[in-house]
């Protein structure tokens, strides 16, 4: 909670809050329209802009409360993660341990203590709600139970387009721990069961999510290119991009185990 005493910094927070006159005006009709149409900061994330506007509307420029909003979402995300894991495997203590590591791991400091990274905790919040809704849906597949998944997924991508892989994550969850691919009946930690759908259905039911993900990828790529955030293949050849991805994966896995030499610039 020491972040409540932190001030604004001039690293992206200026563009997201205190030098952005749309955000500084709070929640206004003009600001809401701007949030849904702007490509400012090389991103299209209207929900994130609305979140910052709401902070200003409620707290003005009291930086501690803006930090507190990040802490709030991170805390809720921790509880959601615990609930989802416990719901899937019925292991309370193991789920609690994973959630605790998620809550306090140093790799999350940047997302929580940096006001400009509101988009990170906000996107995770809606993404976890989408996964939680999916667990409810698979017990009894109906349109009424599917819509919340789609809505939360869209809101997550409108906060930050980092969960475009969610349809694949749900397929992985189908395989394990839900075992929708292997058994005639689905078992849940509360003792309930439901009939296993066909493998084709598992793909078909996620087509709307794949479509949303594809649209988000196209929008993001276009916006990032226009903002100069994506280098050309001539500047960064494909083989260098592949090597960079592999090194990045190895680096992040290593820092998950031993989080040293962390820096804001990544």
Over which residues does each language-model region extend?
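Polytopic membrane enzymes that build or remodel cell-surface glycoconjugates and lipids
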Residues: 1-266
């Amino acid at each position: 909670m020491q972040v409540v005493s932190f001030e604004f910094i001039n690293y992206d927070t200026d563009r997201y809050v205190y030098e952005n006159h749309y955000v500084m005006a709070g929640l206004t009709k003009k600001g809401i329209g701007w949030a849904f149409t702007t490509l400012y900061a090389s991103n299209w994330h209207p929900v994130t802009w609305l979140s910052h506007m709401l902070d200003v509307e409620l707290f003005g420029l009291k930086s501690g409360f803006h930090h507190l909003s990040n802490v709030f979402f991170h805390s809720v995300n921790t509880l959601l993660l615990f609930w989802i894991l416990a719901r899937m495997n019925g292991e309370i203590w193991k789920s609690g341990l994973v959630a605790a590591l998620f809550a306090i791991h140093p790799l999350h400091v940047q997302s929580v203590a940096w006001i400009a990274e509101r988009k990170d905790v906000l996107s995770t919040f809606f993404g976890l709600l989408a996964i939680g809704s999916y667990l409810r849906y698979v017990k009894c597949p109906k349109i009424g139970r599917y819509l919340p998944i789609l809505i939360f997924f869209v809101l997550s991508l409108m906060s930050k387009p980092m969960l475009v892989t969610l349809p694949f994550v749900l397929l992985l969850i189908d395989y394990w721990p839900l075992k929708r691919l292997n058994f005639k009946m689905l078992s849940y930690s509360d003792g309930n069961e439901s009939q296993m759908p066909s493998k084709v259905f598992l793909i078909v039911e996620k087509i709307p999510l794949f479509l949303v993900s594809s649209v988000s990828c196209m929008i993001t790529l276009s916006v990032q290119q226009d903002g100069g955030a994506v280098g050309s293949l001539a500047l960064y050849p494909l083989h260098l991009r592949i090597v960079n991805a592999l090194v990045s994966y190895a680096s992040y896995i290593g820092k998950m185990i031993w989080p040293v030499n962390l820096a804001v610039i990544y």
